[in-house]
């Protein structure tokens, strides 16, 4: 790591991490889509969170990360725990629901809501003014979703699936945006690996509680140990919930939020391409236009 840090500035390294995060996450989404054919969203989320939590423990030890970092207060721990519950237990479960209903390509377009939602939350919570460019970018993203869904006749998806798929996706992005917003101040004062692990632990515990109180808890727990489910779920977890998550948190720590978010948003392009190639999802002109509008809107928002 020292050699890498010597070759690149922290800001450049953060940008590289953000781009790699987008690539790994796009591949993971394809695998998670395949996993969702055998595992329900709640059990799939618990599986990937539990495996990622366990995988990160030896990484923390080898990296020499202080398990009880100095300079943090009880409030900081509480913020990260809440961030993990909202951003992992709730947001990721909603994302998997959206992925099952929409498919990878359309879900990638919904992901473009992430940037406008961050701006909206900062306006509602922090009373930050909304600029003309931010408003324009948000409208472009909304246009992308309308282009992708209005008057779409797809045999494999009903109007109800499209509606709920986009609602689940929008809710997932909202919860994720909120979790990032409250996490950032603590992240500036702590190891990104440590922050990632604490959020994972909080999210995993919350998911276990959610499964225990679910009426289908026996099936949900059973699917966690069914070996046939590991074919896609395990590599998806390695790429998406372990590598991509570590890179994601590290990127936000080492470079500006806007730079990291813009590069993260390139996952939209990767997902649409991979979905067409690996999942044989239709790559129509309408979907291409929606992807361009969504990506363009996200960039306009972040540059504004």
Model features per residue range: what roles?
Residues 83, 130-141, 191-203:
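Alpha-helical transmembrane segments
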Residues 2-24, 29-43, 47-82, 92-102, ...:
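Membrane-interface interhelical linkers
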Residues 56, 120-126, 133-152, 286-303:
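Hydrophobic transmembrane alpha-helices of multi-pass small-molecule transport proteins
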Residues 17, 24, 31, 51, ...:
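Hydrophobic residues within membrane-embedded alpha-helical segments of Major Facilitator Superfamily
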Residues 44-45, 107, 195:
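Juxtamembrane helix-start motifs in multi-pass secondary transporters
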Residues 56-66, 118-130, 173-188, 240-253, ...:
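Hydrophobic alpha-helical transmembrane segments in multi-pass integral membrane proteins
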Residues 26, 57, 85-89, 116-120, ...:
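Hydrophobic/small/kink-forming positions within alpha-helical transmembrane segments
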Residues 51-55, 110-124, 139, 201-206, ...:
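Alpha-helical transmembrane segments of compact multi-pass small-molecule transporters, enriched
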